[in-house]
Amino acid sequence: MRTRFLIVDDSELVRKSLRTVLQANPEWEICGEAPDGETGVELFKELHPNIVILDFQMPGINGIEAARRMSEIAPAVPIVLFTQHASSDLEKHAKEAGIRSVVSKTNAFPMVGMIEALLGPTDSEPAAAEPGNSEKGPS
């Protein structure tokens, strides 16, 4: 099963860039995009994504409030705040709202690795062999 992403950012350029990066992984798909927090919350209810990438500063409700509403609906869904305004104070408020990680738009390179860590191992990844359970061929 593919991992479904919801992207919420008021910048079309940022949404397009994220779409390009995320769609490079054949196991990931973009199930929806929203230009503001309110629309993002509505799409979250409707589309049931596996993970959300969300901007902080947007028209209407900001990313913290959108994340709070999403977390009330489905607390297990990881939310990543992707922002130009990263600070320790913002990270504190983000965690309180249910956001799992804050990534700065000025240094987005770790984004894919961080998403993979949030999602955990997938069915397509081989499981690590348990000690003492190695298969033996015919003797």
How should these model regions be labeled?
Residues 36-39, 62-65:
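Acidic catalytic/metal-coordinating carboxylates
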Residues 8-9, 34, 52:
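Conserved sequence signature across two-component system core domains
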Residues 58:
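Receiver (REC) domain active-site loop signature in two-component systems and cognate sites
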Residues 47-53:
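Active-site beta3 strand of CheY-like receiver
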Residues 65, 85-113:
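Alpha4 helix (beta4-alpha4-beta5 surface) of REC/receiver domains from two-component response regulators
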Residues 45-47, 69-76, 97:
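Conserved phosphotransfer cores of two-component systems
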Residues 2-14, 18-22:
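Conserved acidic segment of CheY-like receiver
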